[in-house]
Amino acid sequence: MKEAKFIFVTGGVVSSLGKGLVASSVGALLQAHGFKVRIRKLDPYLNIDPGTMSPTQHGEVFVTEDGAETDLDLGHYERFTGIKATKDDNITTGKMYHELLKKERRGDYLGKTVQVIPHVTDLIKSFIFNGTEGLDFVICEIGGTVGDIESQPFLEAIRQISYKLGKQRVILIHLTLVPYLAVAQELKTKPTQHSVRELNFVGLQPDIILCRSEKEISDNQRGKIANLCNVSLSNVISAPDVSHIYELPVLYNQCGLGTQVLEHFHLSKPKPSLVGWNQIVHSMRHPMQEVTVSIVGKYTEFPDTYKSLVEALSHSAISNRIEVKINWVNSREKSGKPINEKFMGDKLKNSHAILVPGGFGDDGIEGKMLAISYARTNNIPFFGICLGMQLAVIEFARNVIKFKDVHSEEFYTCKHPIIKLAGDKNVDLGGTMRLGAYKCNISPNSKMAGAYSDTIISERHRHRYIINLDYKDDLEKNGLICSGMSEDGTYIEAVELENHPWFIGVQFHPEFQSKPFSPHPLFVSFIKAVVNKVKKTEG
């Protein structure tokens, strides 16, 4: 039985350098060579998971098929490799200590003093080794930055694994910043040297150094890093900025990253087939048309909050050979300026389509409903996701059905609670979600059925509140069709407006299943509707 090899990806100097994209790109390259891979994320923070963390702190919460709330990097892993992540592919320090303390309370440690070494590090190693049978490579991204106190148990676990398995089964890729100083007009390698010394201090030596920078790093600078960091010149690889993340597998292949990984393990494989990636890059660089989609939300200053959403739009744009320009519209009041109908209209007047994404809390919801009303009354393609769908229902009930006191139980007590809580109110915040993949029945002859070319689908969910079934008849007799229902018929999963070019709201998150090689059918249909609108307008 073959034994998996382990690739560890660490980062130095600063965070947000793109370790997740490096791990994803390496996974894609190894797949192109014919290997079976899996990618995992080890996060040093003390939260159990990112489910209750602020989007401004952490960015998007990516939901897996089996209902885990995970780091947004798992979305990159899925999109680059096509492999569905699971709850076993993301661990946090908080989850580790939670498990450790449960074991201690059960008496599993038989009265021993419970310590970081060996007990925490043993749990980390168990997570890394779990479920690796039949795989060629397991890629593990270590969150945070080398030198952070929170990362030390993870680095110690990697050191122990490296010592036990040896170079024949372990490689360490270190991603580091090589900043450009405009005053000196040169790239500075000193931060990289210090970062590698931090690794050396905990007993680790990188095998490959990836140098992130604004521009290409010269051979002289690479040689300096190689000499001072004890890494061969061929393993010091320049990683300059790119215009789009899907250029990375092609770039890293050209830089020899995949080749160096295989040479480290003394493996020889045919030249990788990157035809698909090259086609994607070509489509992105040579769009035939440009359209503008407005995303109306309250975290528009933090685009990572909507990472999968933006990527799903990108995938559908690639498949339609167009470029999607995003117009970010904040739905909250700013600087004392009220967001009224005129204000929102001015923000949206140059948009070809409007999308209202998911979210929580009542902050900014009136602004979102103004955007929904604008799309509905002006026949502009509209896509509402999760909260976006719920607000579309409330706006419709207010302005079409003419209910006087209608809202969501999430925000207000009202006469017509058209949106209600799905489950038990007396549960911890992190335990009240409807999470993961659920089947949905689609009405034949609906726009939803046309988009999917199917009437039974499975989509990922992350929500507490649902459309109140008591109002289904009111909605439908006024023209808002409930075109998607849960398998058991208890949840309204999708609505669409009659006599509108494209007005669809869904309770689930289709963006989590979209990939560059298989764009999500709803996003493809949405963008096609946008293109058709532009043709009619310009024709």
Swiss-Prot record:
Residues 292-536 form the Glutamine amidotransferase type-1 domain. GO terms for molecular function: ATP binding; CTP synthase activity; glutaminase activity; identical protein binding; metal ion binding. Pathway: Pyrimidine metabolism; CTP biosynthesis via de novo pathway; CTP from UDP: step 2/2. InterPro entries: Class_I_gatase-like (IPR029062), CTP_synthase (IPR004468), CTP_synthase_N (IPR017456), GATASE (IPR017926), GATase1_CTP_Synthase (IPR033828), P-loop_NTPase (IPR027417). Keywords: ATP-binding, Glutamine amidotransferase, Ligase, Magnesium, Metal-binding, Nucleotide-binding, Pyrimidine biosynthesis. It comes from the Bacteria. ATP binds at residues 16-21, 73. Mg(2+) binds at residues 73, 141. The active site is at residues 386, 509, 511. Allosterically activated by GTP, when glutamine is the substrate; GTP has no effect on the reaction when ammonia is the substrate. The allosteric effector GTP functions by stabilizing the protein conformation that binds the tetrahedral intermediate(s) formed during glutamine hydrolysis. Inhibited by the product CTP, via allosteric rather than competitive inhibition. One of its GO terms (biological process) is 'de novo' CTP biosynthetic process. It is an enzyme of class 6 (ligase). L-glutamine binds at residues 359, 387-390, 410, 464. One of its GO terms (cellular component) is cytosol. Homotetramer. CTPSs have evolved a hybrid strategy for distinguishing between UTP and CTP. The overlapping regions of the product feedback inhibitory and substrate sites recognize a common feature in both compounds, the triphosphate moiety. To differentiate isosteric substrate and product pyrimidine rings, an additional pocket far from the expected kinase/ligase catalytic site, specifically recognizes the cytosine and ribose portions of the product inhibitor. Belongs to the CTP synthase family. This is CTP synthase. It comes from Wolbachia sp. subsp. Brugia malayi (strain TRS). The lineage of its organism: Bacteria, Pseudomonadati, Pseudomonadota, Alphaproteobacteria, Rickettsiales.
